[in-house]
Design a protein with these regions (language model features):
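Extracytoplasmic "Venus flytrap"
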Residues: 23-38, 62-64, 144-152
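N-terminal signal peptide c-region/cleavage motif recognized by signal peptidases
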Residues: 5-6
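Early extracytoplasmic/lumenal segment of secretory-pathway proteins
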Residues: 53-67
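Short, hydrophobic alpha-helical packing/hinge segments within bilobed ligand-binding/sensory domains
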Residues: 66-69, 180-181, 200
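An extracytoplasmic/periplasmic, membrane-proximal ligand-sensing/linker region
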Residues: 18-20, 205, 225, 261-326
Length: 326
């Protein structure tokens, strides 16, 4: 490529987003953590993109976010005017199930992740499950989740299958965490597993739930110390290896991607804008006001994490596949 051609392409990119609209699709129903993060990004990202395009948010739920991801891969414009965020649980499914998920996330261009995840499993005070030991000892429980390949379903399946808790049943099919939480409040299910940010403020404060387990090694002061980390419960090296593999995708807890057909120079523009937004004072103040944790992974680093996930040894992938079967 000649210098003149490269300069011309750069000028085209500089002008591309002027008077354009970017659609940010959220593969989850309104109200949950993915939706909150998507709307937060949409409120601030435009200021860091040359041309200051309008950014609109469109919720496109279905099949645990798979519908929105397939739309991005097969139908969405490939010029950089559509960005997608999705239930990160699809990452684990796609790296273990291969063609069955119909999507491979290493074949998308990653813009970044707004935070690393901190996930917990909780049980309603109305249930018989007060602690992890109650669950581990054989007390019956029914936990609710979104799609069968969602992070919530994967978290519950991990507890059940890694620790042989056959008495723990999973009900999937709730449109999103908002509806799952409502099912817990109505005592339709005993509990759920979810991102900490998606757990309603009043649940712990008002003593409505017991926090049983952390699915992430990190924690916060407001999470009860009685909530045990799953990696500490795993009592064999083989189980600990599986836990390590399962939590690796939690590095990309709030992911944002575009089609791999978007021109590389435009991907670079979006990555740069994303990184700048994550350090923007106005953005950070908005995040703090909304109680949204910001612990970003930039686009290049996210791309490498995904490539590493798909390079998982076949024997480990087989074990993870068995654990996630729900």
């Amino acid at each position: 490529m000649s210098l003149a051609t490269a300069q011309a392409m750069g000028q085209d990119d500089d002008n591309f987003y002027k008077d354009k609209t970017i659609t940010l699709t959220v593969g989850i129903t309104p109200g949950g953590g993915y939706d909150q993060y998507g709307r937060l990004l949409a409120r601030h990202l435009f200021r860091h993109i040359v041309g200051a395009p309008t950014i609109i948010v469109r919720n496109l739920p279905g099949a645990g976010s798979l519908t929105s991801v397939l739309t991005l891969a097969k139908i969405a414009p490939t010029d950089g005017t559509q960005i997608g965020t999705f239930n990160a649980g699809l990452l684990n499914d796609s790296m273990t199930e291969g063609d069955q998920t119909r999507v491979k996330f290493s074949q998308f261009s990653w813009i970044g992740s707004m935070t690393r995840d901190l996930r917990v499993c909780v049980a309603s005070k109305a249930s018989s499950i007060k602690t992890w030991d109650d669950l581990a000892s054989g007390k019956d429980a029914v936990f609710g989740a979104a799609g069968a390949n969602s992070n919530s379903a994967n978290g519950i399946a991990t507890l059940r299958n890694l620790f042989n808790l056959d008495h723990l049943k999973i009900i999937t099919g709730y449109p999103g965490i908002t509806e799952t939480n409502l099912a817990v409040e109505r005592n339709e299910v005993d509990g759920t597993c979810a991102s900490w940010i998606a757990i309603p403020d009043g649940w712990v404060r008002d003593n409505k739930v017991n926090v049983l387990v952390r699915l992430s090694p990190n924690t916060l002061l407001e999470i009860p110390s009685s909530a045990r980390y799953i990696g500490d419960i795993a009592d064999t090296p083989a189980k600990k290896d599986i836990v390590d593999a399962l939590i690796s995708s939690s590095e990309l807890a709030r992911p944002f991607i575009v089609s791999d057909k978007v021109p590389p120079s435009r991907v670079a523009m979006l990555r740069k804008a994303f990184t700048e937004t994550m350090a923007d004072a106005e953005f950070l103040a908005d995040a703090a006001k909304s109680r949204l944790l910001i612990d970003p992974v930039d686009g290049g680093a996210a791309q490498k994490i995904v490539e590493k996930l798909y390079a998982m040894p076949p024997e480990t992938a087989e074990k993870v596949r068995a654990i996630l079967k729900n």
